[in-house]
Design a protein with these regions (language model features):
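Ribonuclease/tRNase effector modules and their secretory precursors
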Residues: 1-93
């Protein structure tokens, strides 16, 4: 999945219950989330619990996170909405 041309649907950070406020509760910024969504080396999958698409990768600060998101529009432009993001252990191979 290539999201480099996707638009990201962020709420206002000061709005209670916003997606940007929610990721901040996990110690992440929108820039870190976007660095994974748009980054090289990102792995995509589907969440077992929610059925939503997920992206695993390293942030610009080097943290390994998962981003759970919804696809709002599959046409051009692709629009995605981050639901949550949090740090996870990096898989060992």
């Amino acid at each position: 999945m290539d999201l480099r041309d996707a638009l990201i649907d962020w709420d206002e950070p000061n709005d209670e219950g916003s997606n940007s406020a929610h990721i901040a509760e996990h110690g992440l910024t929108p820039e870190e989330v976007e660095s994974v969504l748009f980054g090289d080396g990102t792995t995509f999958d589907v969440s077992d619990s929610s059925g939503r698409p997920v992206a695993f990768g390293h942030t610009v600060t080097g943290r390994f996170i998962v981003v759970v998101f919804d696809v709002l529009n599959v046409a051009d432009p692709l629009i995605i909405r981050p639901i949550t993001a949090y740090e996870v252990p990096e898989p060992t191979e």
